[in-house]
Amino acid sequence: MSAFTPASEVLLRHSDDFEQSRILFAGDLQDDLPARLDTAASRAHTQQFHHWQVLSRQMGDNARFSLVATADDVADCDTLIYYWPKNKPEAQFQLMNLLSLLPVGTDIFVVGENRSGVRSAEQMLADYAPLNKVDSARRCGLYFGRLEKQPVFDADKFWGEYSVDGLTVKTLPGVFSRDGLDVGSQLLLSTLTPHTKGKVLDVGCGAGVLSVAFARHSPKIRLTLCDVSAPAVEASRATLAANGVEGEVFASNVFSEVKGRFDMIISNPPFHDGMQTSLDAAQTLIRGAVRHLNSGGELRIVANAFLPYPDVLDETFGFHEVIAQTGRFKVYRAIMTRQAKKG
């Protein structure tokens, strides 16, 4: 991270106002402004592991990663700068959590791109910190208010649940496919062979639906799941537990925390990071898979048909197959052979 997002550029127009402030940065932290802005003190809280990785290198323990912020995470802060995400329920979860911890009188700034729906912050916070728009630039809005009343926050009330073919899927705000199984994952699931054995890694696991569906037909697989999102990690753990499926689940920026090799890697990789389109995660997944597959192991991913993954697959593995497709999605399969580049 070096270039600033439009939201951060709007904040920089007001940088003089923050020099004496003890700031908590939270929300969709897409750059390292929290580490670079001139303030009296800065902390950051994020639910995204890859954002925490960047910020913690510069901020140390003042950058925190977790699903729910605690009193220690906001200690001594007199100002909140919240970057609005594209997902309104995610904003609700995070803001109610943070405002329940910050003292009355805290200055509240909310910034975000207009297309993300940042305007709805006014209505969301009306009972706690009435907001006024104080700047508009770079297709972003900046809102300011002061905390007048702490909300009551109960994380348990944000859990959702749905069923897929008799399986229970637990979800939280900010988790991909929160309201039901997406078409791409359905297509990938249709290609999985029953009675598969071996070690399976589910990268970008979301709510864990791919893993539990796979395990139902292949109970002898040994599952490992990872995601950059704290809500996804917690949702996957809950989904596994709800279906009596065992597996290890942890936060990881693609393979950053993954150890060892697997017989199969499955993924429905993201191509958005917040409001921005990003193919980085999927390309890192494909290129890094060769370091985490056993000989003869396979990578199986589903992706929008228009995304340019065949070239990366061929470059990395020497070849690929399309084993299922619709008008919108393709399921790609690549096998770890001697042709594959060993990372």
Swiss-Prot record:
Any one GO molecular function term: nucleic acid binding
GO (cellular component) term, any one: cytoplasm
InterPro entries, sorted: DNA_methylase_N6_adenine_CS (IPR002052), Mtase_sm_N (IPR013675), rRNA_ssu_MeTfrase_C (IPR023543), RsmC/RlmG (IPR046977), SAM-dependent_MTases_sf (IPR029063), Small_mtfrase_dom (IPR007848)
Keyword list, A-Z: Cytoplasm, Methyltransferase, rRNA processing, S-adenosyl-L-methionine, Transferase
Record's subcellular location: Cytoplasm
Catalytic activity, reaction form: guanosine(1207) in 16S rRNA + S-adenosyl-L-methionine = N(2)-methylguanosine(1207) in 16S rRNA + S-adenosyl-L-homocysteine + H(+)
Main location group: cytoplasm
EC top class named in words: transferase
Enzyme Commission identifier(s): 2.1.1.172
Role, per record: Specifically methylates the guanine in position 1207 of 16S rRNA in the 30S particle.
HAMAP family: 16SrRNA_methyltr_C
Family indicated by similarity: Belongs to the methyltransferase superfamily. RsmC family.
Record text on subunit structure and interactions: Monomer.
Name the record gives this protein: Ribosomal RNA small subunit methyltransferase C
